[in-house]
C-alpha cells in the first residue's frame, strides 16, 4: 500500500488551533478549544466542598466529566442520560481528564475544596479526549487564578501546564494530531498527555491494524512532544489574553 500523504497539512503539523478563554459567563473558568473541526467547551467550577473520602484532610480535589452533544457527530448520538448510564468510553475519558489535571496540581495548596471540570464536545472530528485535556487546563488555570486574585489562595497550586495530543501511523506514515478519517483508518493510534517540562502523564497506545515497535513508539512520542509544545504555547497565549 502506498504511503499516506496529507493534503491540507504536513505529517508533523497540528490542525488549526484556537482557544477562546471566558467562553461562558456563568462559571469560574471556561474556554472553547477548536482543533480543526473538533470543538469542545471546557468549564471549571469551584466547589467549597470535597468528596467524603477527603473531608478533614486539608487537601483538595480535581475531577472531570465528559460528554458529547447529540449533533456533534455526523449521525445523531443518543444522549447517555436517556439510556440511563454512561458508556465505558465516556467513563474512561473523564477519568483520563481528571488524572491528567490532578497530576499538575498541589492538592494541599488547593485547600479543602474541589474544582469540577466539564468537557462538552459540540463538534467531533477526532481527538476529542486530547482536546478536552488541553482546553480543560485553560479553564482550570482561569478558575484557580480567580481563587488567587480573590485572596482565597495565597499562591497558585498548579505546578505546571499540561496538554495532550494524538499521534498515529497511517499506511506506514507517522502523523501528528489525527482527524477522524485518519484515526478510523490508522495502523496504530496513541494518545499522549505531557507536562510543560516534558514529563509523561499518560500514554494510551493501540495497534489497530499492525503492531508497532519500540522504535516506532519512540518516534511517535517525539512527534507528540513537538505538538504538545505548540499546544502549550496556544494555552499560554489564551491565558495571557484572559
From Swiss-Prot:
One Pfam family recorded for the sequence: RNase_PH_C
GO BP, sorted A to Z: rRNA catabolic process; rRNA processing; tRNA processing
Binding site for phosphate: 89, 127-129
Main EC class the enzyme belongs to: transferase
Superkingdom field: Bacteria
Single GO MF annotation: 3'-5'-RNA exonuclease activity
InterPro entries per UniProt: ExoRNase_PH_dom1 (IPR001247), ExoRNase_PH_dom2 (IPR015847), ExoRNase_PH_dom2_sf (IPR036345), PNPase/RNase_PH_dom_sf (IPR027408), Ribosomal_Su5_D2-typ_SF (IPR020568), RNase_PH (IPR050080), RNase_PH_bac-type (IPR002381), RNase_PH_CS (IPR018336)
The protein's Enzyme Commission number: 2.7.7.56
Catalytic activity: tRNA(n+1) + phosphate = tRNA(n) + a ribonucleoside 5'-diphosphate
Family assignment from sequence similarity: Belongs to the RNase PH family.
Free-text function comment from the UniProt entry: Phosphorolytic 3'-5' exoribonuclease that plays an important role in tRNA 3'-end maturation. Removes nucleotide residues following the 3'-CCA terminus of tRNAs; can also add nucleotides to the ends of RNA molecules by using nucleoside diphosphates as substrates, but this may not be physiologically important. Probably plays a role in initiation of 16S rRNA degradation (leading to ribosome degradation) during starvation.
The protein's name in its UniProt record: Ribonuclease PH
Organism field: Neisseria meningitidis serogroup C / serotype 2a (strain ATCC 700532 / DSM 15464 / FAM18)
Amino acid at each position: 500500500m502506498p504511503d499516506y500523504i496529507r493534503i491540507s497539512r504536513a505529517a508533523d503539523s497540528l490542525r488549526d488551533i484556537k482557544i477562546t478563554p471566558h467562553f461562558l459567563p456563568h462559571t469560574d473558568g471556561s474556554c472553547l478549544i477548536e482543533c480543526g473541526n473538533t470543538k469542545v467547551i471546557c468549564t471549571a467550577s469551584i466547589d467549597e466542598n470535597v468528596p467524603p473520602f477527603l473531608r478533614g484532610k486539608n487537601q483538595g480535589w480535581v475531577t472531570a466529566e465528559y460528554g458529547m452533544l447529540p449533533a456533534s457527530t455526523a449521525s445523531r448520538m443518543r444522549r447517555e442520560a436517556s439510556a440511563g448510564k454512561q458508556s465505558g468510553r465516556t467513563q474512561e475519558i473523564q477519568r483520563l481528564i481528571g488524572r491528567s489535571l490532578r497530576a499538575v496540581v498541589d492538592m494541599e495548596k488547593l485547600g479543602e475544596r474541589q474544582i469540577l471540570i466539564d468537557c462538552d464536545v459540540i463538534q467531533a472530528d477526532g481527538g476529542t479526549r486530547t482536546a478536552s485535556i488541553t482546553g480543560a487546563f485553560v479553564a482550570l488555570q482561569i478558575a484557580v487564578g480567580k481563587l488567587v486574585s480573590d485572596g482565597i489562595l495565597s499562591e497558585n497550586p498548579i505546578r505546571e501546564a499540561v496538554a495532550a495530543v494524538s499521534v498515529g501511523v497511517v499506511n506506514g506514515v507517522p502523523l501528528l494530531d489525527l482527524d477522524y478519517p485518519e484515526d478510523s483508518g490508522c495502523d496504530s493510534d496513541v494518545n499522549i498527555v505531557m507536562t510543560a517540562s516534558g514529563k509523561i502523564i499518560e500514554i494510551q497506545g493501540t495497534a489497530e491494524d499492525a503492531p508497532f515497535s519500540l522504535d516506532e513508539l519512540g518516534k511517535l512520542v517525539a512527534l507528540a512532544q513537538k505538538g504538545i509544545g505548540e499546544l502549550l504555547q496556544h494555552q499560554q497565549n489564551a491565558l495571557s489574553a484572559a
